[in-house]
Amino acid sequence: MDMEQNYLDPERTMKYAVFSIRNSLENGISYRRSFIVLKNGYGMIVRFTRLEDYAGIYSWRTYKPLQADPEPKLYFICGMLNYMLVENGKRFGIRHVFDITKPMLEEYFNSYAMAEKPDGGYHKESTVEKCISVVTQFMANLSRKFGGYVKVTRDELYVEKTIRLHTGKLEIRHIPNFQATGVFEESDGPFRDMPAKVMEILIPMAIKYAPDIAFGIALQAFAGLRAGEVCNVRQECSHYGAGIRFVEIGGTVRRIEIDVSREYKLRSDDTEIGSIKKHRKQGVYPDFIKIFLEMYERHKKYLKTVDYEEEFAPMFVNSNGLAMSYETYRRKFKALINDHLRPRLVESTDPEFRIYGQMLYENDLGTHALRHWFTVQLVLRKEDMAGLKFWRGDKSPESAFQYLQNKGDLVRELEITADRLVTALLEIGGEMYGL
């Protein structure tokens, strides 16, 4: 097909895009499938390309997990395809993905690294490296499948390098044979710092003004769950199996485990509620078990006051009695911060509260701040890299390493908190908010 754009005829204006759909098995296990499609100028799908088959690491294996979905990679691939075939196909003199050469890829990677984002910034180094890795793997998979039909070869795409592992052992690895030049920017990343004293106010405030998500805040702040994972938590009575389990010894709860090992269908309308980044059974950090139990008991009382689909028994319910979606959870958290926490801090006589409240007018505080707060507490409790990775539910140690690198600053600026949260919940919550 001729990919040259005809801007006067939207039906002939084609663009590569990602299309995703969520399915579920008869036993309720939910999974996502993503495709690379061609859409016309009206946004309608005109063709499924099958190119997604060459994006994943399972392309050449005999077994692939049901939940394996290359969606994040497909956005990088579509960006490259649109640049090569849609935007510059005429200049390059190509009409098919097989015609892409290494010099064309080099141009694209440099263009991606230098491109200014809508917010005025530039792609981070890690994002550029991810783009190069994904696109290189995609082209290598095509070359492996179709051989000489593809102009670029695997030998052109990769170079062998010997690296030294942390164990001291030498290992040969195949590294993408590209180097992109980008604009380096000092960035503090998203605003996410939250002083311990602010958390002590946020918890009782959530119970009063946002009881439907207060326990979700606890799951993030005391068990390190991501917002999308929170929405996948089930009640103890779920027919899929208890979403939360307790280990009690001598009348005392010693361990609490949150089951986010699988995504299940939790709504009768099949609407997606959120995704689990790492499927696992996540424990509540021991120091926070007491406050977590208090929050859980309050949430169970709340659930008795609302209607929900008993067949699915979701832990979090929206105003329609359906499992709460990530987007709804995010909006409710934002409203809690903007409508209640921020005004309370700005009006405080405590200078630290007033300064932080002003910062909330200048920066958006998202749900990721809760997981960041949790991680800071782990660092202050002297957890090592393995401990951070375990309690955070990370796939790689990269994030843990970054926190440990900044440990000195964290110790100086923040403080450990645990028992004071219980006190804040019972005393501040009772006296200040009449809970």
Give residue ranges: language-model regions:
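N-terminal core-binding DNA-recognition domain of tyrosine recombinases/integrases
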Residues: 52-168
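Short, charged phosphate-coordinating catalytic segments
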Residues: 144-149, 218-252
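Flexible interdomain linker/hinge and immediately adjacent N-terminus
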Residues: 150-197
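Basic, Lys/Arg- and aromatic-enriched nucleic-acid-binding interface segment
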Residues: 196-226
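Basic, alpha-helical nucleic-acid-contacting "clamp/cap" segments
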Residues: 250-319, 339
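Short, basic (Lys/Arg/His-rich) helix/loop patches that form interaction surfaces
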Residues: 331-390
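Catalytic-site neighborhood detector that most strongly recognizes the C-terminal catalytic loop/helix
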Residues: 392-417
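C-terminal secondary-structure termini that scaffold catalytic or DNA-interacting sites
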Residues: 419-435
